Swiss-Prot record:
Subcellular location: Virion
Transmembrane annotation, as ranges: none
Signal peptide: none
Residue ranges of the region described as Disordered: 1-25
Cellular component annotations (GO), alphabetically ordered: viral capsid
Protein name per Swiss-Prot or TrEMBL: Penton capsid protein P1
Upregulating conditions: Expressed in the late phase of the viral replicative cycle.
Keywords of the record: Capsid protein, Glycoprotein, Late protein, Virion
Length: 170
């Protein structure tokens, strides 16, 4: 029987290690532990201030966890982890989304991530341009990581037509 573990990770953009040389819309942050054999990632919630230029949608891009494809000319495969609809573009209101409304599906990654100890985060528009969040307006969000069994000497998993199979070449 396959066992999975759910991890919920809270991220605050104000905790980025080098705020003087990064922005709240494009940064890297260390995770509290190394996560192994990540099968899926899902945005649980987000509090997001107004962005510049004003947008109807903001795309959350987290390197290695993206599973949403885009049809925009500069989009492509694995463009974003989540598409976040902003209720009123350009307002100073904080937008909060919650997956209890099934806004953000939990989509399995085509190729599970063997290990991850850092997140590379970008907030983008539909064309892939990194947005601007005014100085001092930080954001906060939570993601859920679903991790499979950690198997020494051959962990990882593979998605086949009949489901997910433990083991593999990683």
């Amino acid at each position: 029987m396959v066992e999975t573990t759910q991890h919920f990770v809270s991220i605050e953009s104000s905790n980025r290690p080098d705020p003087a040389n990064t922005t709240p819309a494009n940064y890297s942050i260390q995770l509290p532990q190394r996560y192994r054999n990540i099968w899926s990632a899902m945005l649980v919630n987000i509090a997001l201030p107004a962005v510049s230029p004003p947008q109807k949608y903001v795309y959350l891009d987290i390197d290695k966890l993206n599973s949403i494809d885009s049809t925009s000319p500069s989009g492509g495969v694995n463009f974003a982890l989540a598409k976040i609809p902003l209720s009123i573009a350009g307002t100073g209101n904080v937008f909060f989304a919650d997956t209890m409304t099934s806004s953000f599906p939990n989509v399995p990654l085509q190729n599970p991530v063997a290990t991850m100890d850092k997140l590379n985060i970008k907030l983008k528009d539909a064309n892939g341009n990194v947005l601007t969040i005014p100085a001092g307006n930080e954001h906060s969000f939570m993601i859920q990581l679903t991790c499979g069994d950690y198997i020494p000497r051959g962990g990882g998993s593979t998605i086949t037509q009949n489901g997910r199979v433990l083991g593999g070449t990683r």
